[in-house]
């Protein structure tokens, strides 16, 4: 059920193929059409060390800093909420709230079973309209030279007073997952002597091959355990040596070091200097 509507005067104009001046002209036309509405610009920002929001209307600039676990999506929604909480000023009854976050507007536009908590707060604040206040919402493209939007963006990125805002479950979950993966990667980065580290230096998941037997063979090559190189362990025999090199059989030696196969390396890879990551890494050959 649709419960919230917004304007998009830039519909049909894709950012990749539209000059900034076109967006500025479209925005100017929208402002002339809704000239009695006080423009209110909102923006949210998130970097590695800062999460904040900015609100600009009349001669007022508001900005606040949030907990680092908050997502940029939540920051964009909170900027809209802050705007609604502050725009009621004497002698003005018509406001147009501009945001460059289409995802925030869409989340307000469509009713879902699990709404973001800030979405609920914003929708409740819309009851202001019943008091004779007319508030409309509009999307505006970011970073195209629209002054109010640029000011809100600068305010959102600036250091400011901290606002105590609860962090929603999804943001906490994502932040915790990112922290765990970061610690995992830092720990794995120290395992430089682990033979798997040179093949898979990142803890990110690799796409699986569609054929299972190919996955099995590739996994055996990556860990260096194959029937050819390790059969002697099952049979209780001595480790066999490569006749020409006088070294034990190993996947690494056969694929990387053995001079007998140099001509194959040059033929297929145009070089005799390869690594296991080149051959059986994320994009295996």
Roles of regions detected by a PLM:
Residues 1-257, 264-285:
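RNase H-like, metal-dependent ribonuclease domains
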């Amino acid at each position: 059920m649709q419960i919230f509507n917004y304007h998009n005067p830039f519909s049909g104009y894709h950012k990749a193929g539209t000059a900034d001046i076109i967006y500025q002209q479209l925005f100017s036309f929208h402002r002339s059409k809704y000239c009695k509405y006080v423009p209110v610009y909102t923006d949210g920002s998130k970097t590695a060390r800062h999460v904040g929001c900015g609100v600009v209307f009349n001669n007022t600039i508001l900005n606040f800093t949030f907990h680092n676990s908050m997502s940029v999506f939540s920051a964009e929604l909170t900027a809209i909420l802050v705007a609604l909480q502050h725009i009621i000023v004497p002698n003005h009854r018509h406001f147009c709230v501009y945001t460059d976050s289409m995802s925030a507007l869409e989340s307000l536009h469509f009713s879902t079973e699990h709404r973001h908590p800030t979405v609920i707060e914003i929708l409740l604040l819309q009851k202001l309209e019943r008091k004779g206040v007319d508030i409309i919402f509009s999307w505006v493209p970011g970073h195209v030279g629209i002054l109010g939007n640029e000011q809100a963006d600068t305010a959102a990125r600036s250091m400011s007073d901290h606002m105590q805002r609860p962090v929603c479950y999804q943001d906490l979950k994502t932040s915790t997952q990112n922290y765990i993966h970061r610690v995992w990667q830092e720990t794995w980065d120290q395992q430089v002597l682990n033979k798997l580290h040179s093949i898979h230096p990142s803890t990110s998941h690799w796409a699986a091959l569609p054929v299972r037997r190919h996955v099995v063979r590739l996994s055996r090559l990556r860990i260096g355990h194959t029937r050819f190189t390790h059969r002697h362990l099952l049979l209780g025999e001595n480790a066999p040596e490569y006749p020409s090199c006088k070294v034990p059989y190993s996947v690494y030696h056969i694929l990387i070091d053995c001079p007998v196969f140099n001509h194959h390396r040059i033929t297929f890879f145009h070089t005799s200097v390869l690594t296991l990551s080149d051959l059986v890494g994320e994009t295996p050959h």
